[in-house]
């Protein structure tokens, strides 16, 4: 982890429970990020927090640290039953829930607090078995949480801490009714520590905070610019016919260590995957159609470096923290300006630098003015020589539902650069 994004504030400076500090230091966490330095004094004083920070700024560890400290410092309610968790962390996607659970495990190992995971797609009985033995902190998506609650596998009457992560995305995905259903089954807001984190604190997110929290304090960490000053942005104007060849040429030129390619539809993602897999790249596909176990396996392979390129839709990739992403390619300019910020926020994280390359084709170039207005600057334009684009491309593979991760290639060096001046 780069230290350039850290503050002088140390976790040990706070009156944190000693086991929490021990767990953090075992993971090499000594200094706070800005959002952690702002949020922790409030949560340690028992104040509710609604936090906004750019992606990759340590929001997850801010609310996990607060949650573990609170549970260790406050007794559970009298006569708490085995099906009553003490803390509930809600996430918009199953991948994000799994990721939060993984980030919480080192804290759980030191403190002895038990974790549970609840998400749709698969693993129903496996997740239920863990819940039946009793958990302190339950992390999950709203649909599976409601399912378990309706069947009385969980009871929310003993909740002491609530976290809502990626609250803006909860709205985008239509989960607000589910969230309100869950809140109605908990003790009143004044009897809980409530935390909400979001990439944007829009009016609707603030309305939710007012409705479900107890006089929340708003904390914001604004970047120098919405897209992050460590991210180099670049824009090309390809024709529809040259777009795929330009992408593959750029990949050969840049030879990224770890890249994510975004497209606006799952069908476009599948097409990109097919071209890159046929050309021998180690590439994975992350869309809503990919089975849950494969999604988790592909994410793990990409995180470990067994895959070099991940092709993804916005919904599938939102909220995921994958370290050391060097490049983001916007094969399609997104229809939503905020999605542009979220996409390129996959790179340039935690003090590192990154490179974002966008292709403004005939189909999606109309999205560019709104994006540039939203981020507050023009994206630098680069030109390319159409005659220098790759032509020796194999026929794309057709996706088989058994393997959306492919390719042995990662030997040798990149080919000569093909851009015009």
UniProtKB/Swiss-Prot annotation:
Annotated catalysed reactions:
ATP + H2O = ADP + phosphate + H(+)
**What is the protein's quaternary organization?**
Component of the RNA degradosome, which is a multiprotein complex involved in RNA processing and mRNA degradation.
Task: Give UniProt keywords alphabetically.
Answer: ATP-binding, Cytoplasm, Helicase, Hydrolase, Nucleotide-binding, RNA-binding
Protein's recorded name: ATP-dependent RNA helicase RhlB
Q: From start to end residue, where is composition biased (Low complexity)? A: 402-414
**Its family?**
Belongs to the DEAD box helicase family. RhlB subfamily.
Q: Which SUPFAM superfamilies match?
A: P-loop containing nucleoside triphosphate hydrolases (SSF52540)
Q: Name one GO biological process term.
A: RNA catabolic process
| One cellular-component annotation, GO | cytosol
**Domain Helicase ATP-binding residues, every copy:** 40-219
Question: Where mainly found?
Answer: cytoplasm
């Amino acid at each position: 982890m780069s230290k350039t994004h850290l503050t002088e504030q140390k976790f040990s400076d706070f009156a944190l429970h000693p086991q929490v500090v021990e767990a953090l230091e075992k993971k090499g966490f000594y200094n706070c990020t800005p959002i952690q330095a702002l949020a922790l004094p409030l949560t340690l004083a028992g104040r509710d927090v609604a936090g906004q920070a750019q992606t990759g700024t340590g929001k997850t560890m801010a609310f996990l640290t607060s949650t573990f400290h609170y549970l260790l410092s406050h007794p559970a309610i009298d006569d708490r039953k085995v099906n009553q968790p003490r803390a509930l962390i809600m996430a918009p996607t199953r991948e994000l829930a799994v990721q939060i659970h993984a980030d919480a495990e080192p804290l759980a190992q030191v403190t002895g607090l038990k974790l549970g995971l609840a998400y749709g797609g698969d693993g129903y009985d496996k997740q239920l078995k863990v819940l039946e033995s009793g958990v302190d902190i339950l992390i999950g998506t709203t649909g599976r949480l409601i399912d378990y609650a309706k069947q009385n596998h969980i009871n929310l009457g003993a909740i002491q801490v609530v976290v809502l992560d990626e609250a803006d995305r909860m709205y985008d995905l239509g989960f607000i009714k589910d969230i309100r259903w869950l809140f109605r089954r908990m003790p009143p807001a004044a009897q809980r520590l409530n935390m909400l984190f979001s990439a944007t604190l829009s009016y609707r997110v603030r309305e939710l905070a007012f409705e479900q929290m107890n006089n929340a304090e708003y904390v914001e960490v604004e970047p120098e610019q919405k897209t992050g000053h460590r991210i180099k942005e670049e824009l090309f104007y390809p024709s529809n016919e040259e777009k795929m060849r330009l992408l593959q040429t750029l990949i050969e030129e840049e030879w990224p260590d770890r890249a994510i390619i975004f497209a606006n539809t799952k069908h476009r993602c599948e097409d990109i995957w097919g071209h890159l897999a046929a050309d021998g790249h180690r590439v994975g596909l992350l869309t809503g159609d990919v089975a849950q176990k494969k999604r988790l396996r592909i994410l793990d392979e990409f995180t470990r470096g067994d895959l070099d390129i991940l092709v993804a839709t916005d919904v599938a990739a939102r909220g995921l923290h994958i370290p050391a992403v060097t490049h983001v390619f916007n094969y399609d300019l997104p229809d939503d300006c905020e999605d542009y910020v979220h996409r390129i926020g996959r790179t340039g994280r935690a003090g590192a630098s990154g490179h974002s390359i966008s292709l403004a084709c005939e189909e999606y170039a109309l999205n560019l003015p709104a994006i540039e207005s939203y981020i507050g600057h023009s994206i630098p334009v680069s030109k390319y020589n159409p005659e220098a684009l790759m032509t020796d491309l194999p026929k794309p593979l057709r996706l088989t539902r058994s393997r959306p991760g492919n390719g042995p290639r990662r030997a040798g060096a990149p080919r000569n650069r093909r851009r015009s001046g």
